[in-house]
A protein has these predicted regions:
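N-terminal accessory regions of nucleic-acid-interacting proteins
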Residues: 1-23
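Two-metal-ion RNase H-like nuclease active-site motif
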Residues: 24-33, 179
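Metal-dependent phosphoesterase core characteristic of DEDDh/y 3'-5' exonuclease domains
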Residues: 40-48, 55-56, 92-195, 199-202
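Nucleic-acid-processing active sites and adjacent nucleic-acid-binding tracks
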Residues: 56-76
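A short, exposed loop/beta-hairpin motif centered on an aromatic-Gly-Thr core
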Residues: 58-63, 226-233
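Acidic beta-strand-to-loop metal/phosphate-binding motif
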Residues: 83-92
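A short amphipathic alpha-helical interaction element
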Residues: 140, 207-225, 238-244
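Low-complexity, Ser/Pro/Thr/Glu/Lys-rich regulatory segments of predominantly eukaryotic nuclear proteins
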Residues: 203-205, 239-263
Length: 263
């Protein structure tokens, strides 16, 4: 198992750190052999957290895929220190993978009070922000973060396979850099979230007036004492809400869950 620890100066105002409780969050990113968590393995993980004005990143990389259990054990120690975590597209990959592997090896990883998938949080506002893409690199560039690394996830997987055969130190350093840089930018992406909220930026895919009227009518019909924040509901989410309200009786909590799980 290869272990690295990096200390980086955190260039975020204390006010924003406190407003968004950024120092109460563990930030992480995994590298895997397959997108299917039942078939693949986690071979690298980077975990970041804030201490004072520093952003600390701890990183574990398997020199052999048989070390995956050890990687999960060490990661769990850090993940379980925090009530909240943040990822980029973690709802689709990192979270299910981590839980799948923790169950496989009998290692407890606690569910989180708050989970922030920055991909899902920021993507609906990309066009309103003038962005053509919703990639991590695109959001990084928007806030002035220039990467050293230029690889994508598929490149990294190929390079890892090369490393397993060659043990080339340069290849190793490149894949470690990619994984750590994927985590380094995560707290900074909250600056975009902060900007969106304080400037009342609208979603690019905001629900239509017709959908808004339909939801309002169905909520009243169901006798729910609830007014959704329509400024945060997409067309896709609106379709789910309308379907759910038509299909069955929903409580306010059920409706909030539908909204929360959509983006």
């Amino acid at each position: 198992m290869i272990y690295r620890k990096y200390e980086n100066k955190l260039d975020i105002e204390n006010k924003i750190i406190k407003e968004h409780a950024l120092d109460k969050i563990i930030y992480f990113d995994i590298e895997v052999t397959s997108l299917n968590s039942k078939l693949g393995s986690i071979w690298s993980i980077a975990l970041g957290y804030i201490e004072g004005k520093k952003f600390i990143i701890e990183q574990f990389l398997c020199e052999d895929l048989n070390e995956e259990k050890d990687l999960i054990e060490k990661s769990a120690e850090l993940l379980n220190r925090y009530d909240s975590w943040a990822t980029f597209n973690g709802k689709s990959l990192d979270e299910p993978y981590i839980f799948e592997k923790s169950i496989k090896y009998g290692i407890e990883i606690e569910g989180k009070k708050n989970t922030y998938d920055l991909y899902r949080m920021l993507t609906p506002y990309a066009k309103s922000l003038g962005l053509d893409q919703c990639s991590l690199k695109a959001f990084e560039k928007y806030i002035g973060i220039d990467r050293i690394d230029s690889m994508n996830g598929e490149d990294t997987k190929e390079q890892y396979n090369i490393y397993l055969k060659s043990r080339d130190v340069n290849v190793l350093e490149n894949i470690l850099l990619h994984n750590s840089e994927d985590v380094f930018s995560l707290p900074y992406l909250f600056l975009i979230k902060d900007y969106i909220e304080k400037n009342h930026i609208s979603r690019s895919d905001l629900l239509s007036q017709g959908q808004k009227f339909k939801i309002s009518t169905l909520i009243n019909k169901r006798g729910l004492n609830f007014k959704p924040d329509y400024s945060k509901i997409s067309k896709k989410c609106a379709k789910r809400i309308i379907y759910s309200l038509n299909a069955k009786d929903l409580s306010k909590e059920d409706l909030l869950k539908v909204i929360k799980e959509s983006y």
